[in-house]
Amino acid sequence: MELVLGYLFIFVARVTDVGMGTVRMIMVVKGKRIQAAAIGFVESIIYILAIGKVLEALDNPVNILVYATGFAAGNYVGIYIEERMALGNIIAQVMCDHNVMQLVDLLRDAGFGVTVVEGYGRTGIRHLLNVSLQRKNLSKLYNVLDTHDHKAFITVTDARSIRGGYFTSVKKK
């Protein structure tokens, strides 16, 4: 029983510390120093405890296998947590084929700020819609776009920071 509890400890510790590491890296990229430092502190303690348990019985290959499995699962869990947190801002660029101003009105009515840029494509004048939004509102943007033009061309990029502009609260349905 003690052996199984040891395996479980190693696995859970690795899932926890690697998951925290993934979230910590996102905090670093987003410039959230204090949160990244706090997560890193706890993460390193958990890591030392897990590796210490493995090194106690390095001749036990199951310890190493459980350690590696916990690492892999921790990456998965960390990405899942980061997706659920949906931190930060993004910029969506949208090109649609028809009724551009109707789409602009729909997006603005839904609470999104929209800037329209006119350009020239292969078939003539095209309109590019720039929409700056919080990442957590991306699915709401997709819902509005799908109801208007499910064939719209959309690119989404991360924005390190956004300053100024027109922002309202995205309206809930």
Swiss-Prot record:
It is a multi-pass membrane protein. Disulfide bonds: none annotated. Pfam families: DUF2179, DUF5698. One of its GO terms (cellular component) is plasma membrane. Keywords: Cell membrane, Membrane, Transmembrane, Transmembrane helix. InterPro entries: DUF2179, DUF5698, UPF0316. It comes from the Bacteria. The chain crosses the membrane at residues 3-23, 38-58, 61-81. This is UPF0316 protein Amet_0954. It comes from Alkaliphilus metalliredigens (strain QYMF).
